[in-house]
């Protein structure tokens, strides 16, 4: 039988749909928020200008973006653009928020929460949540205005050393809190 959950997975947003249907401002917001790209508006504008012709492949998208890519640093900007698309398709920020919010309800008192994040946006969210019990920069407060801390920090930030990165290159951006 078909369940509501499996229907959600059948009809998943694709990067192709994002590139070809999101408004210029929605694309710019996405690229700025998830890719932390300062020239997000310029990139979004360029994508929208090429819309009469559908952008169906990564090669086509790379070609469209070529004129805004800094010489010698193309791969870094492209990585941030594709990261933004992946994060939107997979709803990664929503999933992380949901996970963190549920964690305080399922952890035993005195239990430990360890989270590995792979880029600064995720790490900032995790750090704020552990520090403040919410995703704002201000701590959650009880009825008397006292900070309500759900987590006690134990141990510091852990990042991979050179040897680990040599063995597993994808670990280079990982941060354990």
Segments the model singles out, each with a brief description of its role:
Residues 58-105, 112-177:
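C-terminal catalytic and target-recognition region of SAM-dependent MTase-like enzymes
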Residues 19, 24-90:
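Cysteine-centric redox/oxidoreductase cores and disulfide-bonded domains
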Residues 6-7, 17-18, 55, 107-108, ...:
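Generic preference for hydrophobic/aromatic residues in regular secondary structure cores
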Residues 11-19, 30, 124-126:
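Conserved class I S-adenosyl-L-methionine
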Residues 10-13, 22, 38, 56, ...:
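Short coil/turn linker and secondary-structure boundary residues
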């Amino acid at each position: 039988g078909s369940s509501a959950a499996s229907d959600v997975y059948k009809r998943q947003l694709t990067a192709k749909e994002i590139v070809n249907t999101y408004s210029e401002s929605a694309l710019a917001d996405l690229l700025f928020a998830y890719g932390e790209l300062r020239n997000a508006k310029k990139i979004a504008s360029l994508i929208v200008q090429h819309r009469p012709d559908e952008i169906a492949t990564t090669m086509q998208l790379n070609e469209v973006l070529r004129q805004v890519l800094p010489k010698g640093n193309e791969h870094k900007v492209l990585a941030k653009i594709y990261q933004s698309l992946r994060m939107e398709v997979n709803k990664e920020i929503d999933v992380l928020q949901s996970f963190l919010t549920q964690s305080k309800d399922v952890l035993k008192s005195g239990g430990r929460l360890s989270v590995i994040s792979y880029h600064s946006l995720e790490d900032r969210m995790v750090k704020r949540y552990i520090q403040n019990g919410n995703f704002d920069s201000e701590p959650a407060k009880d009825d008397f205005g006292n900070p309500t801390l759900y987590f006690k920090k134990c141990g510091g930030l852990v990042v991979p050393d050179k040897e680990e990165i040599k063995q597993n290159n994808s670990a280079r951006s990982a941060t354990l809190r």
